[in-house]
Regions:
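Histidine-acidic metal/acid-base catalytic patches
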Residues: 43, 47-65, 71-164
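Active-site acidic/histidine proton-transfer and metal-coordination neighborhood
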Residues: 1-62, 72-74, 146-151
């Protein structure tokens, strides 16, 4: 955590605590996603997420690990899964360039081994985006749908190779 953010941390924990009972009543699980230091100053690593969910201390509050952010913040992608273990509810798969899995430089073998080590059998989400100057703009031109379809097919093939 890049700065003294005790007040932000407390505010976040208190807010999630206040939402946890509503989540329980509606059979919903809230997930805390560590984001890289360029996008968040509160929860950046698996260790941060573990501390956060333990402070909230509610069965409806778990963690989400995102390979894109892990690639920036985690020294050991496998260890991040071991750190959070039973708290991991969702995994976002995204390569370093947000293109199809395998087109960037993330070593997914460490991610897969970490997931298998904890017996992860929950939700996996694929996150890709078509190349272009604005990463936050979904429509990148007339070939966007075609590119995204290609990324999805390539990425699904990788996921099947790793998990099936």
């Amino acid at each position: 955590m890049g700065r003294d953010n005790a007040e932000d941390w407390k505010w976040g924990v208190d807010l999630v605590c206040s939402l946890a009972e509503t989540a329980e009543e509606n059979d919903v699980t809230l997930v805390i996603e560590p984001l890289n230091r360029y996008e968040s100053c509160i929860v950046n690593t698996a260790e941060d997420a573990l501390r956060f969910v333990k402070e909230v201390n509610h069965r409806r509050v778990k963690a989400l690990l995102d390979t894109y952010h892990m690639n920036i913040e985690e020294a050991d992608l496998h260890q991040a899964f071991l750190t959070l273990h039973d708290w991991v509810e969702v995994v976002h798969f995204a390569d370093s360039n947000r293109q199809a899995l395998g087109q960037g430089h993330i070593d997914f073998s460490k991610v897969v081994s970490g997931m298998k080590a904890i017996g992860f059998d929950k939700t996996i989400v694929l996150e890709c985006t078509a190349p272009g100057p604005n990463p936050f703009k979904a429509d990148k031109g007339e070939r966007t749908a075609q590119i995204m379809s290609e990324y999805a097919k390539e990425s699904l093939a990788k996921l099947q190779e790793w998990f099936v």
